């Protein structure tokens, strides 16, 4: 439990003493192997003896904070009992002031003798007062590794809100520098490789199993804790050194204008939270339980005739590993489903041999359709309905987190709960997220964000002109592809009636454009268009001939990746695709096989496995001239027989080449959406209206606003969203909707208080 009950979303720092959590007031239960854990911590402490300080004296902490204020910079890290920012308290924190030893400040470590909080530590309230002194210091910066976690923990556990101080997050900075290399690395790994150039130290989990850190004497844990703050600052210095190189000017701009300013924006969004309609949630739980049970009954109905075979199988194999099947069959077990579908029912086994969504659709049998329905209902229940219990706060709100770099493209992702992944055909579930009493939710997303970005990246004159005229791009492309007028390719007639033929033509044009953006081959496009390959090729050729910028953007993106190992967005963000720098095939002699290698020439050792450039060029040319995989494999085997190793990158290059243009589009969309959030968050006009951000779902921002202010707020939100792309050649539009709940009946902003159904859209690009 947290030390003091928080009241979200209007929490303010209170003057009342911060209590020790009840869970830490009780005598701790014994932990197995605690002696071993303490011995390991002691050994580490002795290794770094004299390099770090453990501070348990108030005057020493005051003096240290004075130094930080004077230097206007510190590294900061927290140590907690767990990863739940709302429940797991900070037991100690570390600071690193330039020119001084890093320190660890213990607060809630347990005594080995009493099992209760050791009294020989600094009080939480006093520590909070000292940390809060950093607020308001002009030019102050704090270095973190995973800033959102530490900043949230300090706030919800200690009442210390450092959100308005300039924050450097080494984790984000290193991820920006290389989206491939630093995706999963942690502080210890990165610091060892780029700063200390030594073998990394032990990670937290390697030294301290869950729930044991604050059970170790703080004199032994201080070195571990203090080092984290020091390493975070040193890694920030390294990252800035890289970002400030001339060739990385675009990345530096992304950090300083997008990622760093976004950190406190996302914290404020999580703090506000969104209200859940419990009555509607209960209604959906009943509905989806019924759907799950019905789907399960359908599955049983389909395999019922095979029960004798199932029983024979069970008699034959019993509990043999890999052969187990229960009765009734466990629908949630992939292993049992494989046995049921492929071994017992004899359904055609897909090439993958799996029972995932794609495989089940390929099987195309009533039982596979029922399994898919079962899984979807189960997913809705476990993730978005029943599973919401663990995220609900006492006031009926959920405070989900947002991973700032949730994807390599720069897109955010939602966690705890993941509200981004609610399927569009189950969007009714979104209606259980509601505005607080007396308020509306304002949802605003970009109209055709990705095709507009495609036009900007392609610099195609016709595409740009289409948008500048306020026309629909896909309809214009469809008119060219099908030799008809623009009006015949719109989804609706001038009177508002749905025009099915126009909608179909527009949809086919959209398929072609997206096919180019996603690097799809003609057969794949033909399959989506439901036409022959020849017909798809004709349409494709006509579109690319009339809109040459599409293929130009595709080629330029692939060439950029080949030359640099990454592609860039319109704002300078990078998506690394390093395989693109390789040749499709690379050659080298096996050890000792180079006929020109002279063992008595010391300068020749480095090239002992290298082929001549002429040989490489010949072999590569030969392989590229072969059309069929079988012929390529035979050629490669011939080289292997000569002692030449061949590395085949062709498949990986093919895969990554399809991502090049799409990565630039998706990354540019991420940049735009993040800039929009920053603009909305800092807009003083919206603050005066008490309108604030709640959620970001892909390119859709969701704000909450008092009912009486919603018209004015919409004007400012649209303005903020559209101006972030004002430097691009294509105008961007945003479409606002106002409702009492997410995806509810839209409020007509022309007439106060009246509701009208927003329908399924107006034919704009998605």
Go through the PLM ranges and name each one.
Residues 2-113, 160-165, 182, 190-194, ...:
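Conserved "right-hand" nucleotidyltransferase catalytic core of DNA-directed polymerases
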Residues 75, 139-150, 441-443:
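Acidic beta-strand-to-loop metal/phosphate-binding motif
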Residues 98-142:
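Nucleic-acid-processing active sites and adjacent nucleic-acid-binding tracks
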Residues 161-179, 186-189, 470-474:
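Conserved beta-strand -> loop -> alpha-helix junction used to position metal-binding or nucleic-acid-contacting
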Residues 227-234, 658-681:
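Conserved pre-motif C helix in the palm subdomain of viral-like polymerases
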Residues 507-518:
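Short, amphipathic alpha-helical "recognition" segments used to contact nucleic acids or chromatin
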Residues 683-738:
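C-terminal structured "cap/appendage" subdomains that terminate the fold
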Residues 742-758:
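Short, low-order "capping/linker" segments at domain edges
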